[in-house]
Amino acid sequence: MLPMSMKITKSTKLSGAQKDMICQLWNMEYPQKLAITPSAFDEFLEASASQTHFLIIENERDLVGWAYTFDREGDRWFSIIISHAHQGKGLGHVLLNLIKEKENRLNGWV
């Protein structure tokens, strides 16, 4: 269950602002050697099909979590990133359960 200050949005396309927020989250949570630029993130997204994005927004402005399902090479995949300040609070579990409502087979990308 999400705190009242948070909501989840779901979309198949991301706005430029959403992409920027996801890049910031990615770069905060992954090691420096896995840092991604906005243009590299666009290339990353373009390499996959049937995308669905789930964004956890806190206080109507701050991205604290992102989940992404996509097709690649005939398989269905997912990825989840949660802000380190919000890890251990069940947000990843909430996102995974949302994904599992529509998917019966998934491969994780970490």
Residue ranges and their predicted role:
Residues 1-39:
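Short amphipathic alpha-helix that is part of the acyltransferase structural core
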Residues 88-101:
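Conserved acetyl-CoA-binding loop-helix of GNAT-fold acetyltransferases
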Residues 101-110:
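Conserved GNAT acetyl-CoA-binding A-motif
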Residues 31-54, 58:
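Active-site rim helix/loop that mediates acceptor-substrate recognition in acyltransferases
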Residues 2, 47-50, 100-102:
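Flexible, charged surface loops at secondary-structure boundaries
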Residues 79-88, 110:
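A short, internal acetyl-CoA/4′-phosphopantetheine-binding micro-motif in the GNAT/acyltransferase core
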Residues 17, 77, 90:
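Residues that form or flank phosphate/diphosphate-binding pockets in enzymes
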Residues 56, 61-71, 76-81:
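Conserved beta-strand in the GNAT
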